[in-house]
């Protein structure tokens, strides 16, 4: 036997290298085979419910890192709730209708307008489901736990029926109406868009300053007067039917030198406009308030058949332009509102593809709307005063990335205005985890217009509306519920397979159809109505979930998207918000803080992370950032996170190895019998437990990460485990001192493994497989530990906080001695302490081997004053010299009792007593040489 064999060197097969990329899929299959998700739900039956409702990602393509961050965050929350006494099922979902899938099929050569619609929709459905399958595997590879066998998908018959019923209730309450308001119109998609489908980019446009000649000045202006107008959308002049001024804005009638004409502009803008138009020696002839100009009639710049009326509008400002805007009710929301109030014609001169129509005039007909500027300039002639190119923020179709226009077309709307206050009142009841999120959603609802819910596309849920022979729209409870039942049985494709009369209840009649003939609506619903109905299609209809949901967690862009549409439909139906809490996340940016895009080549695919690091590192990264704001991710950042993971893993490996001979049922030492330092570490760990439990409850992942890393680095590695080897390796295997420390080791190991499970389930299960004395076969079936409090806890914490200060001072003294070449390692030192009464009392209270805690070979607490050469602090001074004696071959301390023993071992008296007591046979035979 060799002397080193008398040491209790920790033994474990738990590998230092995790091998996550290859091991994770193996563990995940094991969990699936063991039906862990189902077993967890069974365990928690009857406990308080917690419903995190999954916002459905769009089923198209592989997931990106933003998807991963969001789904991992949800998984951490659901797992922590499941391990905290809640019944917390997770039903993942997918959004499957809409234009992107139509675009994919188009790129694949599918020609929608040349094939049977039902066959086309079948292709859309097949593609969508293939993407659901692809993304399901992507999410499962991240270690996300949920009911993957029974997700919700917005194209399933049961979901579509639930969506129809949401619409039906809104129709019954009078919230659905048809109108020809201007809507966001995407000529590139040939469809209306909702606000949530808009994104803004900078666009360079031609702006024109031109003049309308007064035709009837109403006794205020002469007919040789011209009202100066500014526009950034020249094509809309073809539909201009009025000029709008601000009632309380001051306007001036001016005549520049050398000009026969007189002009009206906003007084505040006269100086800048004079410079722009090249006017000199401008004479101000008169000043008017805007309201004095009301109902003056002007000529259209070129269309002699059209008169343009001067009207008042609150939207007019003097921030730019001339303080007067031309008004085309068919091409703008403000224009429409003031136009309708003043009985102006709602003219639309652009078709669904962005092509100018016949009513725009023969010079314009057939031109693309963006290309008409030269023609407009030619038609304006000498009425054009100036033109310039401007860059401004402009709305784009978020899918096609093309600019859009406002365009008045008959559409179906959900009236938000009818119950806006009810929605705002509900927002006040929701808990927002960021105050700015509440303000953002509140302001969006307060300021938004009615919701355009109709789309002129094919792949989506049909609007369950019929038309009588006289054109009357039919959307009554009887017909809508009948359609819902048909969809529930056959799916929404039945709408296109059957004639209108076969979609109506048997023997249905309507006074507007004396001949019994009906037509059906051909528009489909906005996809935001699809996902916005999920509270009904999923949360209400799934018995394991509770409505309203406890939490919605999505990206901050969903304040205008899913948070918004879900809120509107839920309040419209039931008068309550669909969620009790909202937690929003920022976007994942690259390592430089720039937006990720394929064109820049700075994207990171979750699959690449899994191959290089493992999903576990991506999960740990999610907790290492403040995801309420935009976050950064790169392979370098993930490499740093991987180092943190390695530190966590190897620390826990040390605990596993050094409790391998510890049976908690037999070897645990009662708390009251622990040393003071062990009690201190137990208390510090329980503080960590409380911090992490509280942070899980508040969804504060970064708090968990920081607290965990700090505990492992500072409390364990830099202190407790730093001197632990002197105990667990050196002392007798069954000695009280070793069992005391092992008791703390094991307690920390078991509980920290549970605390890590929601974040690092793969690693936690791997650790758990080495803990043979724990009852649960999977740590995921256990509960998070509760924080324990101890007697005299504050007193112990105060004592050891003071000792840590003392320890820091001692380490400075040792460092000085090391720099002066007095010692090499701290274990070579004899440290003499010159304490005052406070420190003396402290060292007595610590009641431990202080030399062991400081990792020095010898320590003397001296009486009397410190020598002049001592390193002095306010309460204590130190001197350092090399310890007397020789190095013990077993404990490596320098000790004056170190000597060669009769059994061929050069060891100190302390080690000799341990060896002679525990290894009598080896002592009798003598140890082998090193």
From Swiss-Prot:
GO terms for molecular function: aminoacyl-tRNA deacylase activity; ATP binding; isoleucine-tRNA ligase activity; tRNA binding; zinc ion binding. ATP binds at residue 598. L-isoleucyl-5'-AMP binds at residue 554. It is found in: Cytoplasm. CDD domains: Anticodon_Ia_Ile_BEm, IleRS_core. One of its GO terms (biological process) is isoleucyl-tRNA aminoacylation. Zn(2+) binds at residues 888, 891, 908, 911. It catalyses: tRNA(Ile) + L-isoleucine + ATP = L-isoleucyl-tRNA(Ile) + AMP + diphosphate. GO terms for cellular component: cytosol. PROSITE patterns: AA_TRNA_LIGASE_I (PS00178). Belongs to the class-I aminoacyl-tRNA synthetase family. IleS type 1 subfamily. Monomer. Catalyzes the attachment of isoleucine to tRNA(Ile). As IleRS can inadvertently accommodate and process structurally similar amino acids such as valine, to avoid such errors it has two additional distinct tRNA(Ile)-dependent editing activities. One activity is designated as 'pretransfer' editing and involves the hydrolysis of activated Val-AMP. The other activity is designated 'posttransfer' editing and involves deacylation of mischarged Val-tRNA(Ile). This is Isoleucine--tRNA ligase. It comes from Streptococcus pneumoniae (strain Hungary19A-6). The gene is ileS.
